[in-house]
Regions:
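Short, well-structured alpha-helical interface segments that form or flank functional binding sites
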Residues: 12, 16, 57-58
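Hydrophobic anchor at the beta1->P-loop junction of P-loop NTPases
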Residues: 6
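Conserved substrate/cofactor phosphate-moiety recognition/catalytic segment
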Residues: 9, 16-49
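Pre-Walker A adenine-sensing motif
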Residues: 1
């Protein structure tokens, strides 16, 4: 099943880009009200469900999915990584962006190895 996952820090255009794809879902809407530990689990359960999923928390869901599915494949999954913010960030947003990039660098090689197509945006 084809799925597009759009990842990146705050202000990078994830939501705007997602609106140009079929069935866009915003990660924050899916995890609202869930405890921190449950958020990654819930997002991991969305991997492979088709459509488009975007949000800053998606990298955590991908990391959790990789850990939970050690032999799982991601053919048909496109991951778009956006790293350049288009707006000035607050100090908190800058810290969040740094954390997201750290997780991204950790998981990107494994995503490729498992068959995901990765597209780097700006």
């Amino acid at each position: 099943m084809k799925q597009t996952l759009i990842v990146g820090g705050p202000g990078t255009g994830k939501t705007t880009l997602a609106k140009t794809h079929p069935d866009p879902r915003h990660a924050d809407d899916l995890i609202h009200g869930k405890a921190w530990s449950e958020q990654s689990d819930h997002l991991a359960s969305q991997i492979g469900q088709g459509g488009t999923l975007e949000g800053a928390a998606v990298v955590r869901g991908l990391r959790k999915w990789l850990a939970q599915n050690p032999t799982g494949r991601l053919e048909g999954t496109e991951v778009i990584h956006l790293s350049q913010p288009y707006i000035p960030l607050s100090a908190g947003q800058e810290r969040m962006a740094k954390g997201i990039e750290t997780v991204w660098k950790e998981i990107a090689p494994e995503l490729r190895r498992r068959g995901a197509t990765i597209r780097e945006g700006s």
